[in-house]
């Protein structure tokens, strides 16, 4: 399996009062000839929510397509199926979902990133 990382970005997210909320990490690879990733893309997009001074909840919101499970979402400790369309839709879906969970709109999330 050959792969090439095409996106690797971390965004520190704060609220309007500049209180640190957590970290968004987006990692996307282009994958060649792998039956586990028929779309040719492997991805992991995570919002690790700050739950204490030095503690983070990595299952607050995570979109990934782990090879054994396929595309799915981890939201507040529960798992849901996800239909992958393309990279742009993936990121848009994640940001909308995150905005809904945090009570922010997508523009506010991007503005703070």
Labelled PLM ranges:
Residues 1-71:
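The feature represents the first ordered module of a protein
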